[in-house]
């Protein structure tokens, strides 16, 4: 469990690390954001692996972003505990937008025990208002259609302002995510 102070201290210490030096220590590095012509820089095209700790370090940079991260972490844990093996994070939270309003998440339903899911994660009524209230973001099964002939996993990989390809994060599901507490 990391306190806000320890996260800030770690950020200061790791500013001088390069992508190459962190890879020597087997750390995954979220790539630098790129400009695709939209209002904010986004992740480069592709699906980029990241742990909860890495996501928090990179994108939990202010109070608003920290609250969104904690909401995502709560939803992520419900999905993981229900058996989802693939959970993806997208939205303005993973851009350079200073104060994003929410995040978008899609998840693979394969192997999920629906009985273990919070029913709110399957409530898409009223523009997903219940999800936003409880988790500060939106959760979509990746196999659902976001648009005609386009599933959420593919839909999230396009910039909504320009239509250009962009990246998303696949959250690593392993023991390392137990270090981040959703109760902070």
Segments and roles (model prediction):
Residues 2, 14-88, 94-101, 109-184:
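Catalytic core of pol beta-like nucleotidyltransferases
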Residues 6-9, 24:
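Cationic, low-complexity basic patches in intrinsically disordered or flexible, solvent-exposed regions
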